[in-house]
């Protein structure tokens, strides 16, 4: 099990943030990046050849930029939700919906006037792409996420204004991309994997709702709903290689969950989000033995 004191320090640090959700999100993002950088062993990758879709034109301080939105059946699809459900999710929590995509390397090209420009290939799941073709909302959402992803990955500042290229599905040539081949299954709910301690009375601590998902192939994130709590005071958390145990103050909550993945407990971090009344846990995963 991980050292409860170490995790308790993380809870206290987030507690001081209070209701400032923006700073909390920044803290969680920073923790996630640190965890991903700590992983030195990466799963093997496989090459895919994305298929052309459509091309948009924008610019940066360096000049013209083209983004080729491509697709491949090898890219995992996002969660299957309606546009109404998606809109509600985005209004409640902008980080609650994820569209898996592969961001390709920049490649130099020449535009129609023979002037130099830069192009990027962004690939999404093929079935999702076909659905996106019939939805302006999904298309604009994908373009926004792709643009922000390229900005983060390559330290760019792209103009949010863009124009779709007519009669030109891509700029230049679409290169092969490497994606991780050892994709672990996306985990949404682990309620049926929950294993309560034997002999616990029905009137005992409540089992909180647990939601987990893979933020990256080597990073597992968890949200534990704790509506009866206003802060992290009295919370205890222990993490083993494949187990998460949480206790609440005054025995309000108790969670003992088996997780069928190998967790790096020493690098795990936790924070309590006061506004959402959730315990957020970021857990890097140990490499799968070859």
From Swiss-Prot:
Cellular compartments annotated: Nucleus
Tissue distribution: Expressed at low levels in normal mammary epithelial cells (at protein level). Highest expression in lung, leukocyte and placenta. Expressed at lower levels in brain, prostate, colon, heart, small intestine, liver, ovary, pancreas, skeletal muscle, spleen, testis and thymus.
Main localization, broad class: nucleus
Positions bearing the site annotation: Interacts with TELO2: 57, 64, 113
TM region(s), chain numbering: none
Cellular component, GO annotation: cytoplasm; nucleolus; nucleus; pre-snoRNP complex; R2TP complex; ribonucleoprotein complex; RPAP3/R2TP/prefoldin-like complex
Consequence when changing residue 113 to A: Reduces binding to TELO2
Function: Involved in the assembly of C/D box small nucleolar ribonucleoprotein (snoRNP) particles. Recruits the SWI/SNF complex to the core promoter of rRNA genes and enhances pre-rRNA transcription. Mediates interaction of TELO2 with the R2TP complex which is necessary for the stability of MTOR and SMG1. Positively regulates the assembly and activity of the mTORC1 complex.
Effect upon mutating residue 55 to A: No effect on binding to histone H4
Lineage, broadest ranks: Eukaryota, Metazoa, Chordata, Craniata, Vertebrata
Effect of residue 166 to A: Reduces binding to TELO2
Family: Belongs to the PIH1 family.
Protein name from the UniProt record: PIH1 domain-containing protein 1
Phenotype when changing residue 163 to A: Reduces binding to TELO2
Keyword entries, A-Z: Nucleus, Phosphoprotein, Transcription, Transcription regulation
Originating gene: PIH1D1
Record remark: domains: The N-terminal region is required for binding to phosphorylated substrates while the C-terminal region binds to the other R2TP complex components.
Biological process according to GO: box C/D snoRNP assembly; chromatin remodeling; epithelial cell differentiation; positive regulation of glucose mediated signaling pathway; positive regulation of protein serine/threonine kinase activity; positive regulation of TORC1 signaling; positive regulation of transcription of nucleolar large rRNA by RNA polymerase I; protein stabilization
The keyword Acetylation belongs to this UniProt entry's keyword annotation: no
GO molecular function, one term: protein kinase binding
Any Pfam family matching the protein: PIH1_CS
Annotated PANTHER family: PIH1 DOMAIN-CONTAINING PROTEIN 1
Effect of residue 54 to A: Abolishes binding to histone H4
This protein's record includes keyword Cell inner membrane: no
Subunit-structure text: Component of the R2TP complex composed at least of RUVBL1, RUVBL2, RPAP3 and PIHD1. Component of the PAQosome complex which is responsible for the biogenesis of several protein complexes and which consists of R2TP complex members RUVBL1, RUVBL2, RPAP3 and PIH1D1, URI complex members PFDN2, PFDN6, PDRG1, UXT and URI1 as well as ASDURF, POLR2E and DNAAF10/WDR92. Interacts with phosphorylated TELO2 and mediates interaction of TELO2 with the R2TP complex. Interacts with phosphorylated ECD, EFTUD2/SNRP116, RPB1 and UBR5 and with RPB1 in a phosphorylation-independent manner.
Residues recorded with modification Phosphoserine: 12, 173
């Amino acid at each position: 099990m991980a050292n409860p004191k170490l995790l308790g320090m993380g809870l206290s640090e987030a507690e001081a943030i209070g209701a400032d959700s923006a700073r909390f999100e920044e803290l969680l993002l920073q923790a996630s990046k640190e965890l991903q950088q700590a992983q030195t062993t990466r799963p093997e990758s496989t090459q895919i050849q994305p298929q052309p879709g459509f091309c948009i034109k924008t610019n940066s301080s360096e000049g013209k930029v083209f983004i080729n939105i491509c697709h491949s059946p090898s890219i995992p699809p996002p969660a299957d939700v309606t546009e109404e459900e998606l809109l509600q999710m985005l209004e409640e929590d902008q980080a609650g919906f994820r569209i898996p995509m592969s961001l390709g390397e920049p490649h130099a090209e020449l535009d129609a006037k023979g002037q130099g420009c830069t192009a990027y290939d962004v690939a999404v799941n093929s079935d999702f792409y076909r659905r996106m073709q019939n939805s302006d909302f999904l298309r604009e959402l994908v373009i926004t996420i792709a643009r922000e992803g390229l900005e983060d990955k390559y330290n760019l500042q792209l103009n949010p204004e863009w124009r779709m290229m007519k009669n030109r599905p891509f700029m230049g040539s679409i290169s092969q991309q490497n994606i991780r081949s050892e994709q672990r299954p996306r985990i949404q709910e682990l309620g049926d994997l929950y294993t309560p301690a034997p002999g616990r009375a029905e009137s005992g601590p409540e089992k909180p709702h647990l939601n987990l998902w893979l933020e990256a192939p080597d990073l597992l994130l968890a949200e534990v709903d704790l509506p009866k709590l206003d802060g992290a005071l009295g919370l205890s958390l222990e993490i083993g290689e494949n187990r998460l145990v949480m206790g609440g103050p005054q025995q309000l909550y108790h969670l003992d969950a088996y997780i069928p993945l190998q967790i790096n407990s020493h690098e795990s971090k936790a924070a309590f989000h006061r506004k959402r009344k959730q315990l957020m846990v970021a857990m890097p995963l140990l490499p799968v033995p070859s």
